[in-house]
From Swiss-Prot:
Keywords assigned by UniProt, alphabetized: Ribonucleoprotein, Ribosomal protein, RNA-binding, rRNA-binding
Ranges for region Disordered: 47-94
Provenance organism: Aromatoleum aromaticum (strain DSM 19018 / LMG 30748 / EbN1)
Biological role stated in the UniProt entry: One of the primary rRNA binding proteins, this protein initially binds near the 5'-end of the 23S rRNA. It is important during the early stages of 50S assembly. It makes multiple contacts with different domains of the 23S rRNA in the assembled 50S subunit and ribosome. Forms part of the polypeptide exit tunnel.
NCBIfam families: rplD_bact (TIGR03953)
Subunit structure and binding partners: Part of the 50S ribosomal subunit.
Molecular function GO labels: rRNA binding; structural constituent of ribosome
BP GO terms, sorted: translation
Record protein name field: Large ribosomal subunit protein uL4
Endpoints of the signal sequence: none
Length: 206
């Protein structure tokens, strides 16, 4: 699979031969959906909680006698039928949202995403991607000069200047290869990969 090599102006300067195992796969929508949903489900913190009828702070005394008042029978104020009562099926922090996804499926899903990005010309390679100082303005100008707006930048190693410069740009995300995930790959309009990161991706995900 041939990928575009961009210069600092965002124009194609050459092409690179990349692994077909990573960038030449067929588009598998069902697998991509499963990988993305599983990743998001496994990232949930599981902190939502509600109270059931046994947990709300209400008296357990019977509000009125069973028969003879003409009113509907009632057992206790914590009943889900009453205002302020407990929920019937309360959410719990112990709810388990995790989904099992084996490594082979995960890698195949990521490769399918990368292949589709390459086919749609939304993925490109750069020799190097950096800024001279940790300033948002410098990175914003660099991206504007390359014609990029919503972009994921994948680097081979941590670049503090680049990372700090990107934190205030909500349409820009900078990740190392080891941090790259399927949700980020499908979220941004363009994906820029450094040559060093490309080599690491081919080594890790094939």
């Amino acid at each position: 699979m041939e990928l575009k090599l961009l210069n600092d102006q965002g124009a194609q300067s050459a092409t690179l031969q990349a692994s077909d195992a990573l960038f030449g796969r067929d588009y598998n929508e069902a697998l991509i959906h499963q990988v993305v949903v599983a990743y998001m489900a496994n990232a949930r913190s599981g902190n939502r909680a509600q109270k059931g009828r046994a947990e709300v702070s209400k008296s357990t005394r019977k509000p009125w006698r069973q028969k003879g008042t003409g009113r509907a029978r009632a057992g206790m104020a914590s009943s889900p039928l009453w205002r302020g009562g407990g929920r019937v099926f309360p959410n719990s922090p112990e709810d388990n949202f995790s989904q099992k996804l084996n490594r082979k499926m995960y890698r195949a899903g990521v490769a399918s995403i990368l292949s589709q990005l390459a086919r749609e010309d939304r993925l490109a390679i750069v020799e190097n991607f950096s800024v001279e100082a940790p300033k948002t303005r410098l990175l914003s100008q660099k991206l504007k000069g390359m014609g990029l707006d919503s972009v994921l930048v994948i680097t081979d190693e941590f670049d503090e200047n680049l990372f700090l410069s990107s934190r205030n740009l909500h349409k820009v995300l900078v990740l190392e290869v080891s941090e790259t995930d399927p949700v980020s790959l499908v979220h941004y309009d363009r994906v820029i990969v450094t040559k060093g990161a490309l080599a690491k991706m081919e080594e890790a995900w094939q």
